[in-house]
């Protein structure tokens, strides 16, 4: 997979909840060891990210910038932990976060193109591109996937994603070869492009468990994490 660093967290219990606890504890410790003053850090959202950030200690560093890598507003009353993750992460790094006060996927490319032209939104997007560290997880295309519970997709779109994709990074869905699985949905997605992740000094994927194996493989084949 051409990775520069791999960390493996062991869970004595094969259940996903146990794996998630050990994984996020290890990830929190790992992030504490690599973040330094002056870093620009882009971060995604989701349960894994929230657990990881919650377990981090407050770091005595300065001049760090934290930016959200994708929109975070949900259409349904399901918590994606976007705001909580971002603000808590920034607080532990003695800074304020730059946010996307928007849904991550809009109904049309026209709407998305108009939104990203806004100077405030474009500033956040550009800061995400400038980030030297990106921290994210992979989602799955199983029915219980957070994206499918947040109201972003029609039934036909959800069906197509389940058939053609293996997972997502920053709400950009890819197939087993790491290629974008639906260009139309991708064109309406607000946030960092997957190709931008390849340029990062540290592109950090935090994920584990049987349910995410295909998504992890696709992400690594695509070269989105190093």
Q: Predicted segment positions?
A:
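N-terminal active-site beta-alpha-beta segment that forms phosphate/nucleotide-binding
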Residues: 1-109, 213, 221-226
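Conserved phosphate- and dinucleotide-binding cores of soluble alpha/beta proteins
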Residues: 72-226
């Amino acid at each position: 997979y051409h990775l520069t660093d791999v960390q493996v967290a062991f869970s004595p219990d094969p259940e996903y909840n146990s794996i998630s606890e050990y994984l996020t504890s290890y990830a929190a410790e790992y992030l504490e060891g690599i973040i330094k003053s002056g870093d620009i850090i882009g971060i995604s959202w989701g349960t894994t990210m929230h657990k990881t950030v919650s377990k981090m200690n407050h770091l005595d560093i300065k001049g760090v910038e934290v930016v959200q890598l994708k929109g975070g507003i949900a259409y349904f009353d399901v918590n994606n932990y976007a705001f909580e993750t971002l603000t808590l992460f920034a607080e532990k790094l003695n800074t304020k976060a730059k946010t996307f006060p928007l849904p991550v996927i809009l109904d049309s490319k026209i709407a998305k193109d108009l939104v990203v032209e806004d100077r405030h939104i474009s500033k956040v997007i550009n800061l995400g591109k400038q980030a030297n560290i990106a921290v994210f997880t992979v989602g799955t295309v199983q029915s219980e996937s957070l994206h499918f519970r947040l109201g972003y997709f029609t039934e036909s779109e959800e069906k197509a994603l389940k058939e053609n994709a293996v997972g997502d990074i920053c709400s950009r869905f890819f197939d087993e070869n790491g290629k974008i699985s639906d260009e139309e949905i991708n064109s309406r997605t607000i946030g960092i492009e997957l190709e931008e992740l390849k340029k990062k000094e540290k592109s950090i994927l935090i994920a584990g468990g049987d349910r995410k194996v295909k998504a992890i493989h696709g992400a690594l084949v695509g070269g989105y994490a190093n």
